[in-house]
């Protein structure tokens, strides 16, 4: 039995931890031993799930550019191979590619692991898990970690049965998807005449330029930070990061590009920039993909996370004729709800978070930033042939209001229990004040549409941290200030909830 506390590594539906020293006060807890034990436990979980013995299983391992990726991949492979399972080294890969390794005829793995911590700093790392059903659920990770806790590390000097260039297969798949969308072939250079710049943030997305855009004829001059570098020396590879977005905005405008694309480290998220330098993020990225899909899925339902704005609902429902289901935070929650709707016969082609996680029904419900980019580029090429700009797709999306997020720290020991109590009282106070509470699946949402204010607020409980985020959007600064004033009144008097950020 391991002395490590592996349960502390769980982060929702994956594993996250500190993999190397280098940041003061942060000590390593995602060790080689932990990866070894988790690898073994994953095999035991797969045996039950697949109905196969360990020596019949084939498992792929990929990694992102992080400096601890290779050693953790090796440690996990040692654990997996010790059970008799065959381990394939996919090297530098992307999270979506590792799921597709289960789908592709050339691989058909029974399961796969991706060593990544997404956009987190260089000292962090983690593990994402896949089987034929997609990414594992919270309960699956919990089971795997509990099993791993009772195992002992196993060594194997040659754990990999073979090396496989998965990224090239995955890139070919994406390239052919563009050709199919445009009814063209690679030799016809269907992206000729388009200028597209890419910011890979020194993560894993550099292949998108060399293996997809250039072979299809696009001009990619001005693309930046394409070389994988696990220290991420230029900016955080995160489409939600202000510095990262400023970098791709600048590159797009300076190089007179038709479109700018930015990806996170492991390429399961993306965002875009129009030729004007306008960023397409949060509400607008969801609006854009909804507009692309609307002609093929009229009247369908778009599933989003809880912090999307009323302007998005207006655009989806009034301008596109779609339905908007505003669900919960957490990309797995949003994707699972989309899958559930389709299984019930309610057509839902897209599940997307404001973070840039987006999954299409027609792409295995996989949150794949590169696949979304492929859809966007295909639409850009079609629009260009008709002398249209891609931004015309969301020209009727109302302008963004004045947004703010306040994070209230919970001082109670049992923060979830206390947070739920706060939400109950908050809702009760809102009802007493005769405020408008629309249908909602997470926290308490209030809409304001009167002479006092135009906008909305959402108070919710963080999924993992002792924090209650309060999101507010007002149509104008005056509206936002009025909503903040109302929020102050509604959250007053909770002794173990620190709301002082509202006073700043």
PLM region spans:
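N-terminal small/polar loop signature for handling phosphorylated ligands or for N-terminal nucleophile
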Residues: 44, 48, 52, 58-124, ...
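An N-terminal, well-structured beta->alpha segment
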Residues: 1-76, 82-83, 159-196
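Short glycine-centered, acidic/aromatic-flanked micro-motifs in structured strand/loop junctions
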Residues: 61-65, 198-200, 274, 362, ...
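A short, gly/pro- and small-residue-rich
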Residues: 122-147, 273-289, 363-374
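Gly/Ser/Thr-enriched, mixed-charge loops and adjacent short helices
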Residues: 123-252
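Proline/glycine-rich low-complexity loops and linkers
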Residues: 90-91, 95, 146-176, 274-354, ...
